[in-house]
Design a protein with these regions (language model features):
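Short, conserved structural micro-motifs that define repeat-unit consensus positions
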Residues: 83-84, 97-105
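A short, histidine- and acid-enriched strand-loop-helix "catalytic/donor-clamping" loop
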Residues: 106-120
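Nucleotide-sugar donor-binding catalytic core of glycosyltransferases
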Residues: 2-55, 67, 75, 84-91, ...
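Surface-exposed amphipathic alpha-helices with a cationic face
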Residues: 93-100, 208
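Proline-aspartate-enriched helix->loop->beta-strand connector
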Residues: 72, 76-78
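N-terminal accessory alpha/beta regions
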Residues: 61-62
Length: 347
């Protein structure tokens, strides 16, 4: 039987963004760990390095490493869980691993690992640096679609839904807009890059003009904070668009917000979310013509729209719940049996 575990969670909690990213996946994972009864201590690495500037310590890397060492010595964790921690070097991780041999090391990594996608070499390098030292690794892409990971220590996790954050039930009411679309050029940047274009813009430009849209991140800036949820809450349907070519199971973390708040969600079939959801819970499409046809079908059948959105909402809250995902991370890391098994856990 698994006892309560002391976990040092080193991940960006976005304090410097003043609430703009209060619904981040890192926060949802953290909430799940606490709700599961674990003793969790946080280091928000990018906030630490942002607050302490020193011309003799570029990027405040030495300062961050010393903070981590002090926290380990005082807290004595059973497990260290890393998020996107990019200010530590190979030698830093090597020292941690050699110095604290009894501590389990794990990482979660949510960015795309798509060869024909954005920042592939950079993201691969960021992931692999920690991968070398971690007992377990958790990614939002199917390990079977990536050729440089060991499937015995690398596992898929979906983007988490947190019922304390994803509180809306859009499937129960009528809305001002038909379709919600939100994209960005990076959550840390927050605003659009000038003259930037990618596959998502091409898809948006080819969408049917017979429905009304609530779109952010194309001609206007992305929407963040509570405004994101207020705009989402004006819509009955949403299209989940991620950068790069489709790869098995990968999605931006908006997928959790769309399903988790009761929108009828469209996603390309090459992401294989039909492995998790039936056609009565989510809508997959083959190409832009198929997508446009299905958008019009559900716009003209509100009863069916709400039924599928409701089913998707219930299923997503059941299988993508942050408590479930956080429990999976801990159990896999310590080699405990996973009790509640769902379709995504087989990857």
């Amino acid at each position: 039987m698994m006892s309560n575990i002391k976990i040092l969670h080193i991940a960006d909690l976005h304090f410097r963004h003043n609430g703009r990213l209060f619904y981040s996946a890192g926060k949802k994972i953290n909430n799940g760990l606490i709700l599961n009864g674990h003793n969790v201590l946080n280091i928000s690495d990018r906030d630490v390095t942002n607050q302490k500037k020193n011309i003799f310590d570029i990027g405040s890397k030495k300062y961050l490493f010393n903070i981590i060492i002090d926290n380990i010595e005082n807290f004595k964790p059973d497990m260290i869980l890393f998020g996107h921690v990019d200010r530590l070097s190979y030698l830093n991780f090597l020292e941690l691993k050699n110095r604290y041999k009894k501590i389990k090391f794990a990482q979660w990594f949510l960015d795309p690992l798509i060869k024909k996608g954005p920042d592939y070499e950079k993201n691969k390098s960021r992931f692999f640096l920690k991968y070398q030292f971690c007992d377990t690794n958790f990614i939002t892409t199917s390990p079977s679609a990536i050729d440089f990971v060991n499937s015995e220590k690398t596992f898929f996790i979906p983007n988490p839904i947190d019922p304390s954050i994803d509180i809306y039930k859009n499937h129960l009411i009528d809305h001002k807009y038909d379709i919600f679309i939100a994209i960005s050029h990076g959550q840390h940047r927050g605003i659009l890059k000038r003259d930037f274009n990618d596959n998502r813009i091409k898809i948006i430009n080819k969408l049917t003009k017979k429905v009304n849209y609530n779109v952010f991140g194309t001609k206007n800036n992305p929407v963040w904070g509570q405004d994101f949820f207020e705009e989402l809450n004006k819509c009955s349907m949403a299209i989940n668009l991620s950068r790069g070519e489709p790869i098995k199971y990968y999605s931006s973390d908006r997928m959790a917000s769309l399903l988790g708040n009761g929108l009828l969600t469209f996603i390309h079939e090459k992401y294989y979310y039909q492995d998790f959801f039936t056609k009565n819970e989510i809508v997959t499409y083959k190409n832009i013509n198929d997508l446009n046809k299905k958008i019009l079908t559900y716009k003209n059948n509100k009863k069916l729209l709400k039924k599928i959105a409701s089913n998707g909402f219930k299923k997503a809250h059941k299988i993508f719940n942050n408590k479930l995902i956080s429990d999976f991370i801990v159990r896999k890391t310590f080699g405990y049996q996973v009790i509640k098994k769902h379709s995504w856990m087989h990857e």
